[in-house]
Amino acid sequence: MKWAIRLTRLARADIAAAWMHFSQSSSEEVADAWQEGLETEITRLSLFPASLPVAEENAFFFKTTYRLLYRRTRRGPAYQIFFILQTSPDDAPTVRVMHIRHAARAPMTRLEAREIESSE
C-alpha cells in the first residue's frame, strides 16, 4: 500500500527556513541539494512509514508521532522529520509531515509538541 504525503504549513516553513540558512551560510547550490535530498527522503515515507521508530518525544503528542532522521552527507547536519499516520475509510492513508527540526536543537518540550500539533 502506498501512502499519500502531506506537509503542514509549519513543515513547509521549516524547510524554507533551513534552505535560507544553507543558502546564506554556504550557497544556493548547497541549499538546493539539501532540499532535494530531504524531499527524496520524505517521498520514501510513502512506502513503509510505520517501519520507522516512534519519536522519543512521542509522549508529548496526542497522536503517535514517528521520526525520520535525514542527513545529506555523512558528516553533515542531521534533521529530524516528525510525522503522523492518518487513516480513514473515506481517504487514502496519509503520512502527515508535522515538523522538521535540526537534531542539534535543544530537546523538544511538551509545549512545543502541542504547538506543532495545533499547527496541523
Predicted regions and their residues:
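Enriched for short, Lys/Arg-rich terminal
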Residues: 72-120
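Small, basic N-terminal interaction modules of short regulatory proteins
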Residues: 1-2, 62, 84, 112
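Short, hydrophobic secondary-structure boundary micro-motifs
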Residues: 31, 53-57, 109
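Basic/aromatic recognition patch in beta-strand/loop cores that engages polyanionic ligands
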Residues: 48-90
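Arg/Lys-rich, positively charged N-terminal/basic patches that mediate binding to nucleic acids
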Residues: 1-41
